């Protein structure tokens, strides 16, 4: 018999004896009816008090008995004693939850990333001049697979560190998937009007280039952007919003950027020479509000760039600029020293579900003779534009987009490349989960003027799945 059962039996005996000893004297007495009732009431009160004390003791014993049984779920454990298998229920130990704690004193730490996977069919990347001797084959492509972390310190510093498991075509040292740094920077933001950012990130030049990869209306950026803008560089910049405190309602009215960079690309710590790339950008938002009850804005921008580069520097970081003998394009790696000067203007107008974006870029590439060594190429001017429009057929869900782009490399007569893109975007869960499909038709002026090199019009279909986390 268990301790609990023995104790309950003792309680029953005590209660029974007390009832007998209390009720019998009451029955033998000859007192008045009221006195007998009073005695019965006192006896009942006494019994209730004793019963409450006994219940308290029973509960105490129950809790002790329960505490002797380990916490957790039971699982079946099978043992073998040499003759038979024995099954026994044993307590499964609870697992300690996994957690991550930052080593520093950040007040904010966010881990995230995104994956973009492409299907590319037809004349793959013909809009980038990838035809003829630089043609690519139909493929599935891991376009971007990035993971990064951002943080914020109470001492007015924020930072970002991000890496990518894929590279743009032509920038990877091998044909395999690589991992390399993209954004790695630290920003001091105590004064919103004058912030200091240093590390590796996109130099502030070009609206389409500075638009995040995950929010583009067209799957790929125009080749004009890729060929002329400097993309990611290592350096430092001063930037800010001058009206943040003096005119908070119009803090986005003006934003300025001014930076100094090595000028020879990302993930390269050694500068190509003792000169730097100087980049500046101004953004003006003269209007932000409602038109016809729709959220709207107008943003204008302008860029300038100057850089003195040595031989071996790639001056088309994420696009193709060098005109080959058959009119196709490839990355422009300088055979000798140069000095580049570039500028651009852009505008973005949004009216509810409608977006209209336009940008023009121009660059002058002039050779320099260094230590008696000629540059090895003729001076040239390259320019181009892109105009992009988007409209939500179903608000926030289904969007149609179109883009017209043109690049004039300026190295051979009639070497321009035009492309028109039509696309559909389905936002399953905003930009976090998005499907995109584009059809691109491309014309080559050089191929049209020189039909002996083959076709001068090209078609491509690109599909993309995007997941952000």
Describe the residue ranges of each PLM region.
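Low-complexity, intrinsically disordered short segments enriched for Gly/Pro and polybasic residues
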Residues: 10, 24-25, 74, 78, ...
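Acidic-residue sensor for enzyme active/binding pockets
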Residues: 33, 41, 53, 57, ...
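A general secondary-structure boundary signal
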Residues: 37-41, 47-61, 65, 114-116, ...
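Outer-membrane beta-barrel pore domains
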Residues: 134, 172-174, 185-189, 200, ...
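N-terminal periplasmic/intermembrane-space "pro-region" immediately following the signal or transit peptide
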Residues: 26-116, 123-128, 248-251, 469
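Outer membrane beta-barrel
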Residues: 96-306, 380-410, 415-420, 444
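Bacterial N-terminal signal peptides that target proteins for export
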Residues: 2-13
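C-terminal segment of classical bacterial N-terminal signal peptides
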Residues: 17-26
């Amino acid at each position: 018999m268990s301790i609990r059962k023995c104790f309950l039996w003792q309680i029953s005996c005590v209660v029974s004896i007390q009832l007998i000893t209390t009720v019998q004297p009451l029955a033998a007495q000859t007192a008045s009816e009221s006195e007998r009732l009073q005695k019965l009431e006192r006896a009942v009160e006494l019994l209730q008090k004793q019963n409450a004390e006994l219940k308290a003791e029973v509960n105490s014993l129950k809790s002790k008995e329960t505490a002797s049984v380990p916490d957790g779920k039971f699982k079946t454990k099978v043992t073998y004693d040499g003759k038979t298998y024995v099954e026994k229920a044993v307590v499964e130990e609870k697992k300690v939850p996994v957690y991550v704690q930052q080593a520093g004193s950040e007040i904010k730490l966010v881990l995230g990333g995104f994956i973009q996977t492409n299907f590319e069919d037809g004349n793959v990347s013909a809009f980038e001049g990838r035809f003829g001797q630089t043609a690519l084959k139909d493929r599935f492509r891991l376009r971007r697979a990035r993971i990064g972390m951002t943080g914020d310190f109470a001492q007015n510093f924020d930072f970002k560190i991000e890496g990518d498991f894929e590279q743009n075509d032509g920038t990877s040292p091998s044909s395999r998937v690589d991992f390399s740094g993209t954004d790695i920077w630290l920003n001091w933001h105590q004064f919103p009007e004058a912030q200091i950012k240093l590390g590796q990130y996109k130099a502030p030049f070009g609206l389409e280039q500075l638009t995040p990869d995950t929010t583009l209306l067209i799957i790929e950026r125009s080749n004009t952007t890729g060929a002329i803008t400097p993309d990611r560089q290592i350096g430092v910049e001063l930037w800010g919003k001058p009206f943040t405190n003096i005119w908070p309602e119009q803090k986005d009215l003006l934003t300025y950027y001014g930076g100094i960079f090595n000028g020879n690309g990302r993930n390269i710590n050694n500068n190509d020479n003792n000169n730097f790339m100087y980049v500046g950008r101004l953004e003006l938002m003269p209007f932000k509000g409602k038109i016809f009850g729709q959220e709207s804005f107008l943003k204008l921008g302008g860029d300038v760039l100057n850089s003195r580069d040595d031989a071996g520097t790639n001056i088309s970081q994420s696009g193709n600029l060098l005109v080959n003998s058959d009119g196709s394009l490839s990355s422009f790696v300088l055979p000798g020293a140069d000095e580049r000067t570039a500028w651009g203007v852009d505008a973005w107008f949004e009216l509810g579900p409608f977006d209209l974006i336009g940008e023009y870029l121009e660059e002058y590439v002039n050779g320099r003779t260094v230590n008696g060594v000629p540059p090895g190429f003729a001076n040239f001017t390259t320019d181009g534009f892109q105009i992009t429009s988007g409209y939500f057929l179903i608000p926030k869900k289904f969007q149609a987009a179109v883009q017209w782009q043109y690049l004039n490399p300026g190295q051979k007569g009639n070497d321009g490349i035009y492309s028109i893109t039509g696309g559909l975007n389905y936002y399953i869960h905003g930009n976090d989960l998005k499907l995109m499909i584009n059809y691109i038709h491309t014309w080559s002026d050089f191929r049209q003027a020189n039909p002996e090199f083959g076709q001068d019009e090209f078609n491509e279909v690109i599909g993309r799945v995007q997941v952000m986390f």
